[in-house]
UniProtKB/Swiss-Prot annotation:
It comes from Helicobacter pylori (strain J99 / ATCC 700824) (Campylobacter pylori J99). Gene3D superfamilies: 3.30.230.80, 3.40.50.11260, Heat shock protein 90, C-terminal domain, Histidine kinase-like ATPase, C-terminal domain. CDD domains: HATPase_Hsp90-like. Residues 548-621 are annotated as: C. Residues 1-341 are annotated as: A. Homodimer. One of its GO terms (cellular component) is cytoplasm. Molecular chaperone. Has ATPase activity. This is Chaperone protein HtpG. Belongs to the heat shock protein 90 family. Residues 342-547 are annotated as: B.
Amino acid sequence: MSNQEYTFQTEINQLLDLMIHSLYSNKEIFLRELISNASDALDKLNYLMLTDEKLKGLNTTPSIHLSFDSQKKTLTIKDNGIGMDKSDLIEHLGTIAKSGTKSFLSALSGDKKKDSALIGQFGVGFYSAFMVASKIVVQTKKVTSHQAYAWVSDGKGKFEISECVKEEQGTEITLFLKEEDSHFASRWEIDSVVKKYSEHIPFPIFLTYTDTKFEGEGDNKKEVKEEKCDQINQASALWKMNKSELKEKDYKDFYQSFAHDNSEPLSYIHNKVEGSLEYTTLFYIPSKAPFDLFRVDYKSGVKLYVKRVFITDDDKELLPSYLRFVKGVIDSEDLPLNVSREILQQNKILANIRSASVKKILSEIERLSKDNKNYHKFYEPFGKVLKEGLYGDFENKEKLLELLRFYSKDKGEWISLKEYKENLKENQKSIYYLLGENLDLLKASPLLEKYAQKGYDVLLLSDEIDAFVMPGVNEYDKTPFRDASHSESLKELGLAEIHDEVKDQFKDLIKAFEENLKDEIKGVELSGHLTSAVALIGDEPNAMMANWMRQMGQSVPESKKTLELNPNHAILQKLLKCEDKEQLSAFIWLLYDGAKLLEKGALKDAKSFNERLNSVLLKAL
């Protein structure tokens, strides 16, 4: 087979250009990424050797080998893992595939240090090698294939694939280093980077180098060169080590390698259980949200091992989805090694491990919540996703309610439900909340006026998930939740009803509102809960479903709502006497637009609003 030339996808070209010309902040991470990829390939081969009958007799000792040539300025990373065939090479090294390249590019901030830290998190680690290499040669042979292939590229838009000769399965990557990066072809540089980032990769990493010694004395002294191969990492599964053997730095370094994250974790939970079930867990709470936190196709951050043998890193059932930000390891002594992913979903052992793990993680979050400053670091990136647990995790609902924070209208800050309850007024029977799309608009809502008169605080909820989960939360500590916009809540305020004579008085004006706004609203009602506001847009029909659709990224058609009017307001009292139909129509539209501004903060037809406003002003002057 002759060499076949391919062109990188557009996004890969952008990425390569970025790697080569921009991300210079932390070049050494390329080695961490390539070693991590090699470790993943070994994990996958181990799993296949357990589950594929054809591979059960394969005689191989998983390892990673590094070598270099300082004269030729090359560095080679070799593993005997699962390997790749031609289609794998095209998919993984030439196209976006599952690499997350597009998301990576959209997440870039322009800060080189921050951007370089994103490389591994977005699964584009292989391409980081182009930060130091002018050319890369990949030779690989898939464990299930007889044919090996070579992939070659200088990172300038194209790559070549050809057949090659390779006896053992696995992948060998040779980097032809740039002149300014030739120091990476050095024993001490490689050793230092591996110890910094890959000390606890659970496979041995060997470094081949030439050791120079001198023998003899005086004129007989001569230089003797000897090729050596040393293991340069511990190759220990850190989670299986005793806590007493580990320091904070060990946990931090393992996290950065495991999670492809240069930042330090907020916290970690290392737990070993012995008894009827035996398992070890090591979970990390990151300090920043992963890029795919709110994507349906998010990648699980937890790996499952059985007796230190990797099983899967793609099972979203290991932890509930509202804890998808957690990174870490579950290692069971009781699950069968050949367990399938289908069996995992119904396995009682794993269900027990999951249940206990959730409680451990929530307890750690509770510990963080004792310190407001630290808790803010957790809650800002992860508070929204934690709320999702209210919808599905009934077992831990009370604990989750304790951990959530809500914006208090009275205090002007985020508070716990416990704090809210401590400040309940003497006759207050409920916890009131108001839903909306924007916190600033909620603060200005006319609905809050009557609650303020009573001295009742209202929690302002502006996350899209709120309208989806809150209707399913009935109470906290025996105190019911009430939507402040609902009629039941307004009745609790003891508002005066609108008398029949007032309704008769406004009958014609309401009809005028309905005729002018027939394409915009569902109807018009007089309201007893408005004080200073003239008008208010009422509830959205099927608000729960609409917000669920927004959460899923679906477009939600504009639905018609009720317009509520304040019969006691001076403007409406004046409109009762307005006989100029054209002017009345302009006033009606201005009042409706004002109510829409309070609801949405914007108008879909600002031009017409401006024309009506100018017309009214002209007549008033």
